[in-house]
Each structure stands twice: as C-alpha cells, then as structure tokens.
Amino acid sequence: MENLFELHADVRVEQGKGASRRLRRAGKVPAVLYGAAKEPISLLFDHNLLFRHLSHDAFYSHILTIHANGKAERVVLKALQRDPVNPNKVLHLDLQRVSSTQKLTIKVPLHFIGDEMAPGVKQEGGTVARLLNDIEISCLAKDLPEYIEVDLADLGVGETVHLSDLKLPGGVEIPALKLGEDYDQPVVTIHKPRAAAEEEDTGAEGDVEAADAE
C-alpha cells in the first residue's frame, strides 16, 4: 500500500494529567508510540494539522510515517480518543510501530459494491442492510489493503454475507474466524420489501386468531 500520510511530532517531556491539559490548551495532542520491541515514546502533534489528516478515511487504515527526534517511524493508528462533548477535539493517540517481519492487527473499512445489481434489490425490491462498516484483519505491512470489497451482485432477499464469505487479498486473515463459527459475523443482508413483510405479519396474526377461535 502506498504511504500517503506523513506527520511531524515533537518528543514530549512534560508528563502527568496537568501537563496534558496545558498541552491540549496550547493546541497539542499527546500520543504514545510503542511496539517492535522498542521503548515507548511520548509524542506531541499539532492538533490542527492532525485533524486535517483525520478527515481522510484512508488515514485510519494506512501505514503512516511519523518524523520525530530526527528519525522516521512507520506506524499504524491503534486508538484515537476524542472529547465526548466536542468530537472535533482529539485528546490522545495510540500509535504502533510497523515491523516488516511481524503481522499487524488493524481494522480496515468495507467497501460495498453491486448493491443496485443484487437480485434481492433489483428484482425483488428488497432493502440492503449493512451490519458492519469495518473488520479487523491480520497481515504483514506489505500486504495491508486499503479496504476489503464486499460484492452484493448475486445476493437475494433473505441472504446474508458473513465474514467467511469475504474474498481477502493474499496474505490477509480475519482473526475472528479462528475462534469458531460463533464468531463468523454477518456483514450485510437484504431484507424483504416492507409490503411483503407486512403481509406476512398480517397473515400470521390471522392464523393466530383463527386458531384461537377454534
């Protein structure tokens, strides 16, 4: 995957909650960089510059280059904390170093295609219900995809695409599937048209009333 994002950071010297509050008021975002058998480093990012990157969906699933203390580190975003009152305010970042020899676990977005061509929509008038927007995958950095494609072109009413149905790029795995069938989550399904569903409900109610009358 092409590296599209480069960020510059300062090494953080001040520690503690009080220092964090002062730094945030000064327009800085505290962060921690860890992994790859190296010591964790506390960093500071400029909030406004960081927020511009966060407006791109690809930022969350790409390998990022962080320049700090005269060195460049390849990392992925592992956690992002926002202000619960003001979501446009970023409070903290967790960044993990990327190793060329160790698999990383990261969430990537799902891209749905073929909605309009799906028999359940085009011929049967059903409604697409997306149950997941992203999934957690495991792979080497060189195999990291920007997204996973979900093709609905052959999906009918009442049919569901599960995690195990997804076509994954080479070298990519879904860790949840190793835990058993109970973890094979539904990804997307096509519901019956509302009128048909209401007719079925009405018919079921009529059957119950007839049975009660007997």
From Swiss-Prot:
The keyword RNA-binding applies. Residues 198-214 have a biased composition (Acidic residues). This is Large ribosomal subunit protein bL25. It comes from the Bacteria. GO terms for biological process: translation. GO terms for molecular function: 5S rRNA binding; structural constituent of ribosome. It comes from Nitrosococcus oceani (strain ATCC 19707 / BCRC 17464 / JCM 30415 / NCIMB 11848 / C-107). InterPro entries: Rbsml_bL25/Gln-tRNA_synth_N (IPR020056), Ribosomal_bL25/Gln-tRNA_synth (IPR011035), Ribosomal_bL25_b-dom (IPR020057), Ribosomal_bL25_C (IPR037121), Ribosomal_bL25_long (IPR001021), Ribosomal_L25_dom (IPR029751), Ribosomal_uL5_bac-type (IPR020930). The keyword Ribosomal protein applies. GO terms for cellular component: cytosolic large ribosomal subunit. This is one of the proteins that binds to the 5S RNA in the ribosome where it forms part of the central protuberance. Belongs to the bacterial ribosomal protein bL25 family. CTC subfamily. Part of the 50S ribosomal subunit; part of the 5S rRNA/L5/L18/L25 subcomplex. Contacts the 5S rRNA. Binds to the 5S rRNA independently of L5 and L18. Residues 193-214 are annotated as: Disordered. Transmembrane segments: none annotated.
